[in-house]
């Protein structure tokens, strides 16, 4: 595991130094929460937000109790385990270190083209001062003047309904994110029933104070309350984005950027200052979040303000008691991954058509309607990700998952209510979905992984989980183009003699398709031979984005059958001929999952087969997504299929095997076929 290797390959001196940091951190005093208001924002830019370790002050001589020290050690151990269990690959580790590591970690030596997918032997050891792999209360370094912080904008929905254990767990996770290089700007949405404005103000004040104190327990610098940084105008200002039709804007940017540069976690209540009267008023939390995203991205157009990026928004995190966006079938739990470019409209339509909750919230103590909340969250992440770089992503999860609480009797009622909404599935050993996503840029479960393949990693056998994941990862994503179009129906065997799709048709960019195949497989396709081979059997093609990934599928005939006989007898075999992803897109953005899902859900929902070399390292990925696999005796092929078990008969398997044995490869070299 690369993150483990990153620890073990350090020198002994560096290891001792990192360990001493952890030990010293136990003895640090807890600082009181800071508070920035509209009356003091003019001094924010002049204040220095240093911890005692940063400004040279000596740590306090007071020591924690034995119980506190034990709790601290257990907390550090839990987080270290969560990092080690993140299932990060070498590619993940390299990408993470280049984005969030120290300046030395980012200066990874250039590699030869042949090794671009792997971390070189020298890359990890050079990151000697990436001390976040040994987690204690890690000293957070202030950024240089020309650096901008990497941040997550976090929405906490209904925190007043969370008990202290739940809030503390979420606070710990957000503090760990900061230790790993991602600083949070937290917006509170307290939408409880209120009888007066005064009552609502009291709730907001109470919850911001609770959250600050919860964060403060996990080291310094702590949380900074920014109350007065969001302004509201009586008229909507001009916007750099058509999505930004809001009266809210960031009125004093230094109230946010100064404490962020010094490592603070920001707490922002959902209220704004009316410019004309300088009075506080309630504000929609989603509009506050969008205003912050626009400001950080340099898209806020206000007179007298520079249109420059003040922070890099890498994540939008929504922690909602209702959890992630539900799957089409409630029994399948939350959607693991959403490609917004392709799926937003259909998912919103599905949610809108769902039956409303007649009896209010299904979770005790939580107000609101799940259906409305899910649609609101879906629209929020779409609007924000539309103005952020394509590398940004959104995580929608529940407080229990964000806190990574293990099985606890105190949460049995709430957990049962969540499972009643999401359904019960087989799941693996629990991981923190937010930490996992930061380290890998992926959800815990692959988007193309069948529900039946989600299993425990502790023993190889299927297990029932005491609770199930309710987390959704959303990205701006890629458009998916499918020929022939599947919006009306899936692909069907063509009647002999009828026109069919050709790879030379004008709708297909053949040079880019060939480049995709050559780049993905690392070898040259014999294009002429391949075109001749598939011209009479092509079923269709799937293209992700600008030919970043794709699949070519065919209708193959078992040996000895002519086209007419195979069609009339229903024995044409749906076959995955080529599955390709550009090397630069492999392991990132879910391109492979997007293509695979389009194949099995839209094109061939009744099953498809393919072959792969027995020693192909991709076979594990294929195995997890298939419904069956068989090694073909006397050959170097393994055969996979996604056909439902009820449809797998002896004749079907014989035809599948015959096709997988008989397809002639079309490579220009003499190497063994892939």
Curated annotation (Swiss-Prot):
UniProt entry tagged with the keyword Amino-acid biosynthesis: yes
Pfam families the UniProt entry points to: NAT (PF04768)
Highest taxon above the source species: Eukaryota
Annotated Gene Ontology cellular component terms: mitochondrial matrix
Transmembrane segments: none
Subcellular location: Mitochondrion
UniProt keyword annotation of Transit peptide present: yes
One of the record's GO molecular function terms: L-glutamate N-acetyltransferase activity
PROSITE patterns the UniProt entry points to: GNAT_NAGS
GO BP annotation list: L-arginine biosynthetic process; ornithine biosynthetic process
FT transit peptide: 1-50
Record keywords: Acyltransferase, Amino-acid biosynthesis, Mitochondrion, Transferase, Transit peptide
EC number: 2.3.1.1
Biased segments, Polar residues type: 33-45
Residue ranges of every copy of the N-acetyltransferase domain listed in the record: 497-665
Pathway: Amino-acid biosynthesis; L-arginine biosynthesis; N(2)-acetyl-L-ornithine from L-glutamate: step 1/4
InterPro entries referenced in this protein's UniProt entry, alphabetically: Vertebrate-like_GNAT_dom
UniProt cross-references to Gene3D superfamilies, sorted A to Z: 3.40.630.30
Catalysed reactions, as listed in the record: L-glutamate + acetyl-CoA = N-acetyl-L-glutamate + CoA + H(+)
Region of interest: Disordered: 33-74
Job description of the protein: N-acetylglutamate synthase involved in arginine biosynthesis.
PANTHER family in alphabetical order: AMINO-ACID ACETYLTRANSFERASE, MITOCHONDRIAL, N-ACETYLGLUTAMATE SYNTHASE
Family of the protein in this entry: Belongs to the acetyltransferase family.
Protein's UniProt name: Amino-acid acetyltransferase, mitochondrial
Organism the protein comes from: Podospora anserina (strain S / ATCC MYA-4624 / DSM 980 / FGSC 10383)
Originating gene: ARG2
């Amino acid at each position: 595991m690369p993150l483990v290797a990153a620890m073990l390959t350090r020198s002994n001196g560096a290891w001792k130094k990192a360990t001493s940091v952890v030990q010293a951190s136990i003895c640090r005093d807890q600082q009181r929460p800071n508070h920035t208001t509209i009356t003091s924002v003019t001094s924010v830019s002049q204040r220095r937000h240093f911890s005692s370790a940063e400004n040279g002050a000596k740590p306090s001589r007071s020591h924690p109790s034995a119980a506190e020290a034990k709790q601290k050690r257990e907390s550090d151990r839990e987080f270290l385990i969560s990092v080690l269990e993140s299932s990060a690959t070498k590619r993940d580790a390299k990408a993470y270190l280049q984005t969030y590591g120290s300046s030395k970690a980012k200066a990874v030596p250039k590699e030869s083209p042949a090794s671009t997918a792997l971390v070189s032997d020298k890359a990890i050891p050079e990151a000697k001062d990436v001390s976040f792999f040994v987690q204690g209360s890690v000293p957070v370094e202030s950024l240089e003047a020309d650096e901008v912080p990497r941040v997550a904008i976090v929405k906490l929905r209904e925190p007043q309904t969370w008990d202290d254990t739940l809030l503390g767990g979420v606070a710990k996770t957000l503090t760990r994110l900061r230790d790993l290089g991602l600083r949070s700007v937290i917006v509170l949405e307290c939408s409880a029933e209120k009888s007066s404005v005064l009552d609502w103000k009291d709730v907001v004040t109470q919850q911001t104070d609770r959250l600050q104190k919860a964060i403060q327990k996990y080291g310094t610098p702590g949380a900074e309350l920014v109350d007065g940084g969001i302004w509201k105008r009586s008229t909507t200002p001009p916007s750099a984005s058509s999505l930004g039709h809001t009266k809210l804007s960031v009125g004093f940017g230094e109230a946010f950027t100064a404490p962020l540069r010094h490592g603070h976690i920001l707490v922002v209540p959902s209220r704004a200052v009316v410019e004309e009267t300088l009075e506080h008023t309630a504000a929609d939390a989603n509009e506050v979040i969008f205003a912050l995203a626009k400001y950080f991205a340099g898209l806020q157009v206000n007179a007298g303000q520079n249109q420059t990026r003040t922070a890099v928004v890498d994540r939008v995190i929504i922690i909602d008691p209702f959890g992630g966006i539900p799957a089409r079938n409630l029994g399948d739990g939350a959607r693991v991954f959403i490609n917004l470019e392709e799926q937003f409209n259909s998912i919103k339509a599905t949610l809108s058509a769902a039956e409303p909750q007649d009896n209010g919230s299904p979770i005790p103590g939580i107000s609101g309607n799940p259906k409305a909340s899910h649609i609101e969250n879906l629209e929020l992440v779409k609007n924000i990700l539309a103005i952020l770089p394509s590398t940004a992503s959104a995580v929608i999860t529940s407080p229990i998952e964000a806190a990574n609480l293990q099985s606890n009797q105190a949460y049995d009622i709430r957990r049962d209510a969540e499972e009643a909404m999401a359904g019960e599935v087989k799941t693996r050993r629990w991981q923190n979905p937010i930490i996992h996503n930061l380290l890998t840029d992926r959800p815990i479960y692959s988007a193309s992984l069948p529900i039946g393949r989600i299993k425990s990693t502790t023993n190889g056998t299927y297990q029932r989980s005491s609770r199930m994941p309710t987390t959704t990862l959303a990205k701006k994503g890629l458009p998916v183009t499918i020929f022939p179009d599947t919006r009306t129906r899936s692909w069907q065997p063509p009647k002999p003699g009828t026109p069919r799709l050709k790879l030379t048709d004008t709708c297909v960019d053949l040079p880019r398709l060939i480049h995709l195949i050559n780049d993905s497989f690392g070898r040259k396709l014999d294009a002429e031979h391949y075109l001749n081979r598939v011209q009479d059997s092509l079923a269709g093609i799937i293209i992700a984005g600008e030919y970043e990934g794709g699949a070519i599928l065919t209708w193959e005939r078992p040996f000895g059958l002519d086209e007419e006989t195979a069609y009339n007898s229903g024995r044409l075999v749906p076959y995955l001929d080529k599955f390709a992803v550009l090397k630069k897109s492999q392991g990132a953005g879910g391109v492979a999952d997007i293509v695979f899902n389009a194949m099995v859900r839209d094109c061939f929902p009744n099953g498809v087969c393919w072959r792969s070399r027995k020693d192909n390292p991709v076979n594990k990925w294929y195995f997890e997504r298939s419904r069956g696999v068989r090694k073909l005796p006397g050959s170097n092929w393994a055969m996979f299929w996604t056909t439902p078990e009820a449809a797998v008969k002896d004749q079907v398997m014989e035809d599948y095997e015959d096709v997988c044995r008989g397809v002639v490869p079309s490579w220009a070299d003499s190497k063994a076929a892939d």
